[in-house]
Amino acid sequence: MDLANREIIAYNFATRPKFSLVKKMLEQGLSRLKPTECPIIHSDQGVLYGTAEWVKMLEGKAVQSMSRRGNCYDNAVIESFFAILKSECFYSRSYHSIAELQAEIEEYLVYYNEKRIKLAFKGLSPVQYRAQYLS
């Protein structure tokens, strides 16, 4: 998630945590940047984000930031997003397969980025807010 406009810029799916999952997600996110841009990549203290391979992937491309142990406020923005995702996409619905669930999440992420307005952005979606900011 880009903290400037709350846009989901990279995501991936798996049935269990694997390094290939976060590696692909990082590659997706970094591919959207200009070569001169160096983002801050923030994560929790999950085991995948502390590996030597992860740190090496970030070298010269991004600054690593990790949440403090036991401090939920460090990840408040993404936790808020997941609460919204659950309330708007999961509660009171049932899915018959993982593929069906994945398709619904992908559709929701397009909606969230391009159409779902945010009051903090004066009624603009994350993509609209970014476009306005950059123009």
Please state what every model-predicted region is:
Residues 1-135:
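Charged DNA-binding/catalytic regions of mobile-element recombinases
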